[in-house]
Structure formats: C-alpha cells, structure tokens
Amino acid sequence: MLCIKNGTLHTAVSKEPVLADILIDAGKIVEIAPQINGSFEKVIDASGLDVWPGFVEAHCHIGLDGYGSGNAGADYNETNDPVTPQLRAIDGINAMDPCLNMAAKAGITCFATGPGSTNALGGTFTAIKPNGKRVDNMIV
C-alpha cells in the first residue's frame, strides 16, 4: 500500500483545502483522513504540496488530431459530409499520440474523445484513459 502523508488536498466536497493523508491500495484510493497510521510499502511526504484529484476532459480530440504525424493521422474533422454518424472515435485513436502522456502528466485521468464538431452530426465519442499502448486496454 502507498500512503501520501500531510498533503494539502483540494476536493470536490470542501471549498477550502484540507490537510490529510491518502491511503492507496492496488491503484485505488481506499481512505482519506487527517492522519493515517500503519505500516506501508511506500510513503510519500507531501508536506507543503498541493494534491488534486484526477481531472476528466469531457470533450476533446486527443489521439485523433494527428499531433506529431501530420494530416495523415488527423481523424476528427470529416468535411466530406455534414452528417457522419457512422464515424467512431474508437476506430481512429492513436494510442501512441504524445499528447496522451502530456495530458496524464498534467493530471488528466480520463478523456471523452471523438470526431470533430465541424459536422452537424459528427459521430460517436469514446471514453479512454491515457495509459496503455493499445486502444482496447485504454477504453473506460
């Protein structure tokens, strides 16, 4: 288990940040409390540091915009028809898009990514996490 100690937590339930510890087991938060005691595999001292929850990007085109590969990898704005409901983000996501790693480092833990907004009806979005090298392992 991992324990993050003495962090200044910014949460969705309190207007003001709170000083607290966070206990994590198998990648999941299992407890948040003012003080957690015990024996842990790893302890991170977050004294003087701000701790934020993971952010969710509700509308983006990450993995679809061809960043780093140019127009050949741009799979989000189909301009050949104003109505393209058959387009599916899952079919065009580039799991190796460097933007995924950049966004994860910035604290974004989940994305709703999909076809562009050029069309009146542009297709289906997909929710993904920025980890993994294969799209089927990234799907939420």
Region roles according to the model:
Residues 1-40, 49-51:
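N-terminal metal-binding scaffold of metallo-dependent hydrolase/deaminase domains
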Residues 11, 63, 119-122:
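Flexible loop/turn segments at secondary-structure boundaries
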Residues 49-115:
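Metal-associated gating/positioning segment near the N- to mid-region
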Residues 104-140:
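Polyanionic/metal-chelating signatures
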Residues 32-33, 66, 121:
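Glycine/Thr-rich phosphate-binding loops of Rossmann-like dinucleotide-binding domains
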Residues 40, 73, 120-122:
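Short secondary-structure boundary/hinge segments and terminal tails
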Residues 4, 42-44, 56, 112:
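Hydrophobic/aromatic beta-strand patches that form the interior of the parallel beta-sheet core
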Residues 5, 20, 89, 124-126:
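Structural beta-strand/beta-sheet cores of well-ordered domains, especially the beta-sheet scaffolds
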